[in-house]
Amino acid sequence: MWADIYHKLVEIYDIKAVKFLLDVLKILIIAFIGIKFADFLIYRFYKLYSKSKIQLPQRKIDTLTSLTKNAVRYIIYFLAGASILKLFNIDMTSLLAVAGIGSLAIGFGAQNLVKDMISGFFIIFEDQFSVGDYVTINGISGTVEEIGLRVTKIRGFSDGLHIIPNGEIKMVTNLTKDSMMAVVNIAFPIDEDVDKIIEGLQEICEEVKKSRDDLIEGPTVLGITDMQDSKLVIMVYAKTQPMQKWAVERDIRYRVKKMFDQKNISFPYPRTTVILSEKKTN
């Protein structure tokens, strides 16, 4: 008899456990589908909005899309979590009432969360940077991949993805907003003909100006900017469109190398002068 009762209880609890797991799985599936569906609607909304009469830069649209998706996901996560807690017969209302909103916030570190979210709001509101911008944040440089309510993600050229809490962002340098300055310093031996080199650099500047459409001003030969024991340095500078300074600098350096080869001008190298003295002996 006792064995029958035991097996009956096990059967009942097994049924309840399976039902509980199925309910949790159902909530998770609904949350997953809800997130995917919301992402699709948000994408469609901003795509249609970008084609409306009110034009916004594509970077701004990408930023708003990312931010809206993050906000909706947080809401769905919260609702799914509350539904799962309800399966444990835990009422969120009574939980907040018993614990107190203030103590619960402190206990879960919500102060930092609120700080991050407020900072994220002002980043968007003040248009400090957008998705796709190349920025330097707290000494870390990279391209902004995502701006969320809590964190900002930037990817460096070679050092991976950096995830920075919005509340920790103290200083931002945005290299995409305005024009940039391309600067190339050309060094050559001090005994070379300066006029010949300046003339060649001016020809290069004219060639670059005619061949590129990403220049705002220049390039211009500034003149000799440094004198050392064995070399002189001439600076060439140009104002470029955002994110084009490096391409312009590479182009100028390439043309300078070809010009030096054609004119038989050597690049400076360390020199050591040795003076030998001969002693006369009787």
From Swiss-Prot:
Where this protein primarily resides, as one coarse class? membrane
Record topological domains on the Cytoplasmic side = 47-66, 111-282
Q: Which locations, inside or outside the cell, does it occupy? A: Cell inner membrane
User: Which Gene Ontology cellular component annotation is one that this UniProt entry carries?
Assistant: plasma membrane
Mode of membrane association: Multi-pass membrane protein
Q: Which residues lie on this side of the membrane: Periplasmic?
A: 1-23, 88-89
Keyword list (alphabetical) reads: Cell inner membrane, Cell membrane, Ion channel, Ion transport, Membrane, Transmembrane, Transmembrane helix, Transport
Q: What InterPro entries does the record tag this protein with?
A: LSM_dom_sf, MS_channel_1st, MS_channel_C, MscS_beta-dom_sf, MscS_channel_2nd, MscS_channel_C_sf, MscS_channel_TM-2, YbiO_bact
- Chain ranges passing through the membrane: 24-46, 67-87, 90-110
Q: What is the effect of changing L276Y?
A: Loss of channel activity, possibly due to physical obstruction of the ion permeation pathway
Q: Enumerate the GO terms in the molecular function aspect.
A: identical protein binding; mechanosensitive monoatomic ion channel activity
What is annotated about its quaternary structure and interactions? Homoheptamer.
Protein role: Mechanosensitive ion channel that participates in the regulation of osmotic pressure changes within the cell, opening in response to stretch forces in the membrane lipid bilayer, without the need for other proteins. Has high selectivity for anions, and may contribute to resistance to hypoosmotic shock.
Domain note for this entry? The C-terminal cytoplasmic domain is important for channel ion selectivity.
Q: Which family does it belong to?
A: Belongs to the MscS (TC 1.A.23) family.
Q: What is this protein called?
A: Small-conductance mechanosensitive channel
Organism, scientific name: Caldanaerobacter subterraneus subsp. tengcongensis (strain DSM 15242 / JCM 11007 / NBRC 100824 / MB4) (Thermoanaerobacter tengcongensis)
Upper classification of the organism:
Bacteria, Bacillati, Bacillota, Clostridia, Thermoanaerobacterales
